[in-house]
């Protein structure tokens, strides 16, 4: 280990919890091919997960990434997940057009040089390596500037230290600065809805719920099929992949920058709209509209996709 790396790690240890490292990258391709390109390495706040639960044993997700010590090959962290690209490449557009999607991997900052391996599930169920990257925790190119000052984090419900709890982050999109009171009320209402439903009701004390204020210039989000276009703070939009009720955030970097102000493992984006809609992608995020009569059902339903990789009942 270099002297610089040793100094960095000693300073981190003296400061307390291990920081979170985020790898931002671009996933490009079509139905026939794909490629990965590094965008940035970003240092976030303290890692919210428990150090004894760093390895994902669920075997869920279309993709999996592993962090291994570069010298010994020891597995330090792993996580299965799904992605927007993984859904898009099954569409008819992907048969004729190539597109690019911004994605991120988050994990505790390694104590020494490490290798990150991203794999995709093959037809036989096994994982095959698609991309790898070597990282150095002392790399001066790592962005240590911190979260944007405009993102304000507040506590909806705290039942313990982040490392000992499941940390859920709620982010509102399409709420103006004058609608922050509504956003706070919506976040609290949805939290109560989640914990009124089993099995979350029985495990309420195992969760922390955080929220972040990200004001938009206009109220509401884009609904292209209705002729409504908004440049909301997170750029959430209905009509994802041509499905009118499917709500996604395609600007991953904007979303991750806002979320970086909070400790989180799971995230649900609440859009300030009355139209039925939502979505849930395993270990990425979930979305829901705030003011539809089906919002309570959709909120819990989409969180199930995101949190546990649950399939739809009709599949």
Model-identified regions with their sequence ranges:
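Catalytic Zn2+-binding segment of zinc metalloproteases
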Residues: 303-315
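Fold-level signature of zinc-dependent metallopeptidase catalytic domains
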Residues: 140-201, 211-221
């Amino acid at each position: 280990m270099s002297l610089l790396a040793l100094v960095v790690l000693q300073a981190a240890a003296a400061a307390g919890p291990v920081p979170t490292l985020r790898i931002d990258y671009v996933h490009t391709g079509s139905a026939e091919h794909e490629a990965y390109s590094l965008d940035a390495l970003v240092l976030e706040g303290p890692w919210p997960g428990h150090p004894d639960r760093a390895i994902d044993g669920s075997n869920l997700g279309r993709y999996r990434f592993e962090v291994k010590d570069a010298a010994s090959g020891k597995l330090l962290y792993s996580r299965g997940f799904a992605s927007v690209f993984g859904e898009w490449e099954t569409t008819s557009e992907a048969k004729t057009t190539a597109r690019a999607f911004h994605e991120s991997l988050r994990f505790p900052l390694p104590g020494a040089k490490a290798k990150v391996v991203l794999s995709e599930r093959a037809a036989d169920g096994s994982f095959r390596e698609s991309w790898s990257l070597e990282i150095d925790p002392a790399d001066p190119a790592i962005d240590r500037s911190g979260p944007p000052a405009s993102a304000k984090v507040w506590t909806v419900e705290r039942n313990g230290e982040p490392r000992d709890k499941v940390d859920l982050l709620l982010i509102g999109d399409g709420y103006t600065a004058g609608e922050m009171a509504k956003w706070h009320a919506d976040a609290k209402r949805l939290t109560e809805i989640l914990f009124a439903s089993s099995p979350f009701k029985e495990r309420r004390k195992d969760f922390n719920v955080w929220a972040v204020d990200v004001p938009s210039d206009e109220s509401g989000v884009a609904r292209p099929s209705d002729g409504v276009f908004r440049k909301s703070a997170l750029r959430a939009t209905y009509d994802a992949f041509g499905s009118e009720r499917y709500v996604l955030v395609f600007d991953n970097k904007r979303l991750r920058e806002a979320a970086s102000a909070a400790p989180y493992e799971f995230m649900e984006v609440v859009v300030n709209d009355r139209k039925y809609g939502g979505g849930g992608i395993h270990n990425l995020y979930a979305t829901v509209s705030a003011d539809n009569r089906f919002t309570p059902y959709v909120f819990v339903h989409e969180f199930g996709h995101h949190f546990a990789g649950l399939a739809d009942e009709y599949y």
